[in-house]
Amino acid sequence: MTKAKKKAGRPKGSKNRKGKESELARSKRSDLHWFAKTYLDMDLYPWQVDVLKELNYKESRVALKAANGSGKTSMVAAIAVLWHVISFPDSLVVCTAGVYRQVEAALWPTLKRYVQQLTGGEGFEVTQSGLRFVNGARAIGFSASDPHKAEGWHRQGESNNLLFIVDEAKGIHDDEIFHAVERCQ
């Protein structure tokens, strides 16, 4: 599979960036595919749309197997992280990968780029190890080399939401990390 195409140019509605976060957070139709298309002006492949639709359901568990460079991190995981922190105040997104380099060098820079595109950076703080949004939601990342780091994350905030992303799961050889993720709630 090849990488999803992204239209060149400014995001839709970019002239009115300041109100985007609250408009999105209030929107009852704010699903991940709609978010990617409306706010990031992305054209996604059907398989990416299907994955994002599956992630719309609370308590969903989605496993994705796709080719290298197909957009798993940049077009699926990053969209899910950004959508989640905007849509669910005070919520938490936990991101891990077999090596932290995947989170640090692939996911966070993509998030930073999307945040700039979406808001010009307003309302977000993107650091080397995480993302904070003005509504209190946050995303954190760590290496899956130690299963104990996956322990103890819980749903939080008004929305009672937790999103856990295991990127490049094929590089995680210890099943304990997956058992730890299953116990998080």
What is the predicted function of each stretch?
Residues T2-K5, R10-Q185:
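Phosphate/NTP-binding elements of NTP-utilizing enzymes
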